[in-house]
Amino acid sequence: MITIASTVNRGRSQGLLSRLRSRRFAAYWMILPLFVLIVGLVVYPFVWSVYLTMENKQETKFVGLKNFKDLIGYGTFWLVVGNSFRFTLTAVFFKATLGLMLALILNNLPFRGQRIWRGVSMIPWVMPLALSSMGWWWVFEPTHSAINWVLVQFGGTAKPWLSDPFWARVSTIVTNIWFGTPFFMIMYLAGLKSIPESLYEAAQIDGARALQRFRYVTFPMLSRLIAITVMFSTIVTF
């Protein structure tokens, strides 16, 4: 009797083990196509591109890090790096600041008006990049620039928006801010909606003013979201 019971228990345990193994291998088989796709489209091209950077121009000889040493020695390389850092830091700062300001304004609007203005504010972000680029090119175009026309009408002077290095940097930063601010706005607005109203009520009962409520309630609750959006935008902008 004992032998029969032990045999049955052993059979059940082996059946359970085989089912677990089959489920585990089934999971591996399910993720295998995605794994192959990632390796083929991401890992292999990345490794191959790194290898190509370590060959000579004719791609006939492996030169190691010589190309990187030559690149670091060029003055143009550091000029490009400096411009990229200035462009990224300036654009991300203004996008994050303006996005937070717009989110705070929209969050205090009535629900119906909030929906309308939220949709209007998202137009720059959802507009096709080619179309928005053509629009901004018309704004900064040297011959018929809309901004230069306004400046001249108010007694100012026309600016070389696309030919002068300084003004070209300003125009590209302004365009990037216009395009990227709605992303920050919608992310911060979603974060504001998740903050419990009880926190603001408690702060108001304690006598906290609007700026104090923002400093001690709103900003701490949005700090993680701000860090994530700034990091993501920095990677994309750079």
What do the predicted segments below correspond to?
Residues M1-S22:
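Short, Lys/Arg-rich, polar N-terminal cytosolic tail immediately upstream
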Residues R23-F238:
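A structural signal for multi-pass alpha-helical bundles of membrane permease subunits
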